[in-house]
Amino acid sequence: MKESIIIKNFGPLKEVEIDDIKPLTVFIGKSAGGKSIIMKVIVLMRYIYKMVNIRSYLKNAKITRSPFKLRFNSLLHDGLKGMITAQTEIYYTVEINGNKYTLKYTNRGLQSDINIPDKDLIFFKEAYVSGMRSLIPIWASKAVSVKGENLGFFFHETFNDFNDATDVIKEQKLEYLNLKMKVRKSGNRPKLFTIESLQNDAVPIELRYASSGIQTSAPLVAIVHYFAQEFSFKDAFQRSR
């Protein structure tokens, strides 16, 4: 599978073309230059492409009535809607088995009416890790008292991914620090996250009281571990149908 994307006139992005989105792609540039916007647009288009694959799967199975509709504007969150203009263009292309499939957003409209044969169908999980992830420890410790509060779509998506991860992962090693994060749950109380040493009997501390670096990195490591080793594509596919 090969991905490419062209983005024109989207917020601070005047024209961006990435011919091959690699598994590890690093963006380097000045602050507020639009790096996070690029990633949000890629995640958005990947999500739409995933849903097009599901729709194609159902259509190929002779289920002609789609259980969902793709409305581009309803998928724009955290200020992205205000970055769209009449001049905005997005072209997202996936090449698989020598065949190319392109989603387009032009003239304020999404063009996603493509059908993908069974041999080219793919299903994946896209995840955007919010830059506000350092707030996860304090948010998790006050999960009940802050119910209904809103820190933005992408933060809550990241927090939900972390919450799902720590439903499964009860001990996450942070070997680069000789530490581990332990997860405990008791009744209806919020989960308790503690940081403990891998080598000695140092007194454990709650994640929310750990250093800023640990507060930022521990949730990220847990999320990556979850999607790499514990995530169930079968369950996710059934939820998406």
Regions found by a protein language model. Name each.
Residues 6, 46-240:
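Phosphate-coordinating catalytic segments in nucleotide- and nucleic-acid-processing enzymes
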Residues 22-26, 130, 241:
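Short, proline-centered helix/strand-breaking motifs
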Residues 1-43:
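Pre-Walker A-like glycine/lysine-rich segment at the N-terminus of P-loop NTPase domains
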